[in-house]
Each structure stands twice: as structure tokens, then as C-alpha cells.
Amino acid sequence: MSDDQVLDCVIVGGGLAGLAAADRLRHRRVLVIEAADRVGGRIRSLPRGDYWLNLGAHMFGGPGTRIGDLAAELGLETRPIGRALIGMAMGGRRVFRGAVETFPFRLPLSVAARLSFIRMGLALRRGVAGAVHALGPRPGETAAEARARGLAWDNGATLAQRIGPLHPQIETILRAITERTGGDPAEMAAGYALRSFANVWSRHSPGCNLVGGSSLLPEALVRRIGDRILLGAEASAVEARDDVVTVACGSGSTARVVRARSAIVATPAFATKRIVRNLPPATAAALGAIRYGAFLSAAVLTDERSPMPWDRNYAISTPERAFSVVFDQASTLRGRGARAPGGSLMLFRGAKGAERLLQASDDQIASAFADDLAAEFPECRGRLREIVVQRWEAGAPFSFPGRAALQPALTMGLGPIFLAGDYLEFPNMEAAVATGWEAAEAVERRLVA
């Protein structure tokens, strides 16, 4: 593809939003520019025989969701998460089944801590009920309107403010179960956190796993997009002049300038602010105000020959450990027959806890996680075959009080440049695909005008 050619669209960023946009525009002359040596962004998995190691996003929507339908369209197999999403291991006690309302009475807590847990639970239940009522679909509402409404709901206070003072043990529990959303209770907006609880507090699984590992999705998109992806080419400038967008990327002998009639910038908010030239001041300020929380994950391949304590759970919270949650990535492979040997876990830490651990080396993190896993679950001692550490310094954009006020500046027209990414909505794979598709549709409308 010649640099003298004017493309229909250049897409900056090869994460899920960028790939989704490129896939929608694959009938056009497009080019995806990605700084890393692989696509997928925060989706990453590694095949390991009958299992796989998941290091990033792993919960897919089912049929009827954008991400679920896209996976099916690409011929990929997703399976419902048929295991409990709420379990806790704390103080030598395992509470893996039963209603969450019983946890205060089943965990080893003081009387004061039990009462604090109950107060927290009641506050969360009230908030979740409000979220379900307020965030339901409304007839005639556009996707952008629904997105803005979701961001604005209960956006004036943090989760910690909404719940009130807690016993120190319960503060630790709350931090552990909210870390996967990117922020701490004292940072994240109450509405954002309650929406996350609403997704999890269900008798039914909120999603599926992709059999074979999450990376199969971006890999399938790459096959369909074809050889129109440029890896290892970090964009340094995106600028619109006279209805032509120029993108400078690469450096030294690999430096090049790509020209196109339009551009979709699907990079994190802070990168978008850095590379897009001549942004309106309000948009630049809004992009700079988006906050990201760190994620740290360790994928663990195990070789056990007998059932393990996590077999009936998909997620187990571990408030007192170096990691805050254990995800059983092999759970969707467990049927009613004999249990196959081996397995795959993801050990996760997020927010401030992840930030602290990121100061250590990969070997130190792997050792700390392995020691704590064996301490919490002695059954796995000597059964850990491999540990792969993955650092996500910008793991997820989280909503904070006042975040909703930024949305108009983030969605205003920028001429031939369009923005996409999960920072525009509640951050998950569904949001990445939705914003990528919407940007692609806007490009298509511009091209045919």
C-alpha cells in the first residue's frame, strides 16, 4: 500500500474497538496502525493444549449482545459461565456457595464487622435496585443518549460516600470486590460501581467464555480484515487538513505518513489527547481527565489429577491475599462427566493494589501469587506448572464523580476524525465493539455524503 495513496479510512489502534471498526469498513480501503507487535489490546490469551491462559478480558456477552453475536459470526464457540460468580476465601474459611446475604454470618468476622457487612450489603442492594430501574432500555433512545444517561446516573458521589463508614475488615472486602472495575471505592462514582454489582448479583451468568481463549476473537478479526494492519508503528500525530487526515507513525527507517479521507482514533484517552492535533480545548481537557486504574494478572496452568476447591466457582474473592480474586478459566470445560486433569486460573489484582505490586519484578509477583495461592488452597501445592504475569498499567477507565459532564466534549464532531474506545462508556468488550462500530458507521456516512 503506497504512502501516496489516499485511503478511505486509517484506524489508529488495534485493540478491540479499532478492529471492530476496521471489520465494519473492510469493504473500504482501510489501514489499521498499531504500536504494539500484536493486536487485541487488553485481550490476550495463550494456548496450552486442552486449556488456555487468559491474561486480560475474559467475560463475553451471550447471544443478542454485540460481542456475543460477533463471536458467533466469526465461527467462534462461546459457552455460558455456569459456575458461581460470588465466592470468598478469608480467614481460613471458604464461602463458595449460597446467597450473598448469608456471607456476614459465615465468614470469621467480629460482631462489629458483621454489622458493618450487613449495612454495606443493604446499601449495595438498594443501589443495585436503583441501577436496574434507572438504566433499563427506553423506547426511542439512541445509543449515545443511553450511554450519557448511564454515565450520569448517581455520578455525584463516590461509592465510599454512598455506603458510609465501614469496619476495617469490611473496607478490605469492599476494595477486593471492586478492584476489577479499575478504581477504589473512594475514587469511583457510586453509579459506576453499582452498575458493576448489578451485572454480578444475578442468579444467572452475565456472560460467557470463549473456548480456546479470548485472543481467538481478535485473531479471527485479523483474518477477515486481511493484510491491512501495520504492527509496531506507533502513531505520533493525527491531523486533519482540507478534509484529508494525515497520520505520522513509526520512527527512523520505518517512519511513514499515511493519508486518508477519514480517521478513527481507537487509542486510550491519554494517547488520543497526545497524538490528535488541533483538538477543541474542551475535548482535549476531557480526554486528559479520563482516569485509568491498573490491572495485574497472572495466568496459572495447573496439573492436578483430582477435583479442586474452585471447581464449582468461576470467581472467588480473596481479600487477604496478594491477588484479590481467582478466576477459574477452565470452568466452562467442566461437564457432568469425569473431571479432566489439569486446569487454568487467572489471579487478578486491580486499582491501588495493582499499582503497588507493579513496582515488583515479574518473578517477584509470580512468587508472591504462587505462595498465597498455595496458602489459601493447599490442595494446589506442587501443582502449578506455569505462571505468566501480565501488566496492564492502564487496565480500565473508571468513572468518577463528575465524569458524566465530560461526555459532550468527548462526543462532539471533529470533522473527519472519529473517536472510539471503552473510555466512552462502561468499560467492557461490549462498549469497545459498540463505539468501534458507531465510528465506522459515521465514517461510512461521511464517505457517501
Question: Positions of the model-derived regions?
Answer:
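Glycine-rich, N-terminal phosphate-binding loop of Rossmann-like dinucleotide-binding domains
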Residues: G64, T267-P268, D422
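Conserved flavin/dinucleotide-binding core of flavoenzymes
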Residues: D4, V100, W310-R312, V326-A449
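Mid-domain catalytic core of redox enzymes
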Residues: D4, A233-L358, A375-E376
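Glycine-rich FAD pyrophosphate-binding loop
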Residues: R26-R48
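Active-site/ligand-binding neighborhood in enzyme catalytic cores
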Residues: G130-V245
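Hydrophobic/small residue at the entry helix of a nucleotide-binding pocket
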Residues: L16-A17, V39, T435
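Dinucleotide-binding Rossmann-like beta1-alpha1 core, especially the glycine-rich loop
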Residues: Y51-A134, A148-R149
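N-terminal Rossmann-like FAD-binding beta1-loop-alpha1 element of flavoenzymes
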Residues: L7-V32
